[in-house]
């Protein structure tokens, strides 16, 4: 029996002779439809089409292979029914020649067949990505050298504006950014020149009609509509009476003012600007609270009016921070710089093209551009027309079918237009995709191509037609209802670029059937009533402000951090998975298995954890879930270069190339290949403190130190040197891939790692390095030195390669993957984690923004005055880019939701649940009845914000509404079911490993069970054993390891307790006691801020450790350094915002800061964040220990010294403090940390071998240095 197609699917399969757009929602069977359409075209009708007369374009090579395989299977099945069919046999024979391919592969085929038309050597190859990056870097270096030699003033201004203080790296990055961006379009040089000319503007009147001005106006009208809506709601509340009538004196004219602004905007940007500059909000009339019936209504009306006021003030003070005249002048001023920059980009592009031609290589951008060059000609007037090759393709292809059309970009669209008959008679393009799943903006995917056709194509007979497949055959009704509710409430033309309404909603197409004896595995037939399926969509929120173990903020040491919320969220997920696998009520959770046609018990492999990005999350999740005994796998794409086996081999390669590298030589010597010990390293270093280890090893082998070292160590050194010399000799002539395999064999290291834990994985990693070397050998670079550069570049450009994949798809493990990697897949149970993570908008902070339609958005930079500010054009482009970023995030969320077949669980964390619920309710209350208005959606900072905003309007959202005090109109008609649970930290602080069962030992006092003297004797013996006391019991409380912070705290607590006893003894007045003892339990403290004082201190220390000491003079330099840390994801965006750059500048301007900088600039040693481990007597920690018994006991002390630096006459120790300190209480503050600083001094004295001359605390709060006196 064949597949039963829906009416819409039948139309998509059989409609011919038109351009056809199939909008296929998630789970609608679009691939099956596409394959069936092809099969019918090549096997049915009076004139079946040969399969090589079709061009089928897919998004990935894997998709192309799957498509070819499915078509082949379908033809083979048809042949089984009709073995004599010559037509079918012909199609099977032609299948290998069929153009079922990615766009890049099609372009490559066109180039190979027509290389002579573009003067290309037929022996070309596709360059390795890293090889191409190295070529780019070489070209940039040569280009800048030539430009500096020309001594061009405009170039110097460009370097001053965008270059760094010590290098041109930033300007290099900008040139590469421009190049990569323009190459995603069909006419890169033309686009760049046209967009630069937009800066050549002379009057305000020229602004009108600019595309970016229209976008700016769209953004402004959104803000004005928001402001108007809030004011009218405030008016409605005030008009209801209850004592709020005085507010109407302000609100009525303010509503008129906003309406006038909207009218002015419709008449032009100049009129709007003039009107905006005159806009004002007076002081709100006071209302006596005693006369107010409903205080909540008062607060709501006031809040709505204030929010409206902020919107207008933001437009006036930020968007239009300069006048229109200044905006025009600013753009004019940037015109020469932009022209110079575009010239550099074009020159770079030309040189890069020439270098590739010289080496006979192409990159992926070349494939599309050279293909287009072959496919187009120009007429006498310069207009583009199809070339002869393109015309031949138009005749050849009966149909061009494009899969995943929503992810096409402009140049691919142009190529499809050249080889198809889209715009002429007999249209023949079939496009299938779902714009709601367009999530590849970073690859320059342009969803507007899909949207433009979606809007203009008709649903009935026409040359341009669309068909909508919105029946979902993947998910249960519970999932469908949940997806539809969330996205009807949130997704709009503004955020999502599509209005999600009834027409766009998913329709149920899957049939799972009731759970009964006929469709369940045999072993569960008798337990039908004890089985579970599906259930509510679950929302789990970690409240980071929940109950915490009490600790004052200033007691948290700088080396300490709160337990990471990522770990806690992983524990929530661990508990949910355990609950699914083994419910506490003894039931069983079941999923439907299509292959069995029955329900079976859930397995780990049925569960996937989806994350927006796996970096910094997946590894923690794997570790935490492991503590619950959950098998889990995460393909993070990272960690390869950090594996011990790869680090060891790379260390060997580094010293074979250049042995004068101590870090690499120590790494190699410490490895099992040579097995040097730490003590032997110390012995070698003591022989000579100034020379490289390699030089010392050579001298050892030469016999210079025979009296100072053992024969065994000399033998080890000779063994190492002999091997190193042999390897260096072979490396000079062997191809690098052969040499690496020789190393594996000669050291037996490949076999050795195979015996280690995860040995198969480790050997696979080594094979990847060998394969990488083989790829390198095919490039234009040769030799070990260049290979090491190649690997270093690979680390920087690609970040990491990820460990080798050895996991089969049927392994019974929970998988962790990014939402992007999950696209096209489906899972019975989806756990969407990390939804509280804020959206990444870092790209919007860059100096220059690029947009395909709107052009170039840059700051206005005055090099001479050293000032910069955003141009009006940049404001517009930034706003547009932000809308596109958030629209894509909305679509990514849709992709995540629609991966679930039967169960969806959502987790996320917030800093303060009560505050978050208030914000969600506020956004909901100020929106329409059943939707969150786009302005409020734009305020959301995370997926969790969006989901919870929507749920405030849902019947199951009581928990959120109750916490947030929300007075909201509910959508009572929705069928989806949701359950909500908030988690406090205290619930999650124990993992499964920490949980211990209590051993309750009952001691019977009665002797009714004692029957003999023997029994009595045994009882006495048992009691003696149980009553045994360890002789050294006092030392059991003394830790073997302790941090400096813990030691400081222990002493402070002892002092605090003594002070408390003194107070109790000496003060009879109860009030005085209360005044002096001010500690409160954590739950009585006021709610903490999003970043505690301790967390801010940790962030400050991190910045002080990593900041470039050459860039600490000016505020802008420090701010730029912090921004770099955020871009590199060393700090989160929110952490970057709390860094007080002014405080940091104050330090470096202080006497102490200047002394540190002077040491740095004069080449003396400056150390930051030095970790140490030393030993101290245990009596320092436990003062009640008897020195006669414990005097020799030592405790290992560990800590981190913030900074110390060298001066002519000795070293200076420095410790940063961010604590709150009252002016005048400096002495108490010094005493508080004196023991810590003295321990640091003692440790440094041992390390340096000389006395530290001075020690300081630096208080960021007081902005002063505090000297610690010698004791």
UniProtKB/Swiss-Prot annotation:
InterPro entries in the record: AddA, DNA_helicase_UvrD-like_C, DNA_helicase_UvrD/REP, P-loop_NTPase, PDDEXK-like_dom_sf, PDDEXK_AddAB-type, Restrct_endonuc-II-like, UvrD-like_ATP-bd
GO molecular function annotation: 3'-5' DNA helicase activity; 3'-5' exonuclease activity; ATP binding; ATP hydrolysis activity; double-stranded DNA binding
Cofactor dependence: Mg(2+)
Residue positions binding ATP: 24-31
Domain UvrD-like helicase ATP-binding: from-to ranges: 3-476
Catalytic activities: Couples ATP hydrolysis with the unwinding of duplex DNA by translocating in the 3'-5' direction; ATP + H2O = ADP + phosphate + H(+)
CDD domains, sorted: DEXQc_UvrD (cd17932)
GO BP of this protein: double-strand break repair via homologous recombination
Top-level taxon of the source organism: Bacteria
Oxidoreductase keyword on record: no
Keywords of the record: ATP-binding, DNA damage, DNA repair, DNA-binding, Exonuclease, Helicase, Hydrolase, Isomerase, Nuclease, Nucleotide-binding
Domain UvrD-like helicase C-terminal: start-end pairs: 528-824
Family classification: Belongs to the helicase family. AddA subfamily.
HAMAP family given in the database record: AddA
Function: The heterodimer acts as both an ATP-dependent DNA helicase and an ATP-dependent, dual-direction single-stranded exonuclease. Recognizes the chi site generating a DNA molecule suitable for the initiation of homologous recombination. The AddA nuclease domain is required for chi fragment generation; this subunit has the helicase and 3' -> 5' nuclease activities.
NCBIfam families with a match to the protein in the record: addA_Gpos
Entry protein name: ATP-dependent helicase/nuclease subunit A
Organism annotation: Clostridium perfringens (strain ATCC 13124 / DSM 756 / JCM 1290 / NCIMB 6125 / NCTC 8237 / Type A)
Lineage start: Bacteria, Bacillati, Bacillota, Clostridia, Eubacteriales
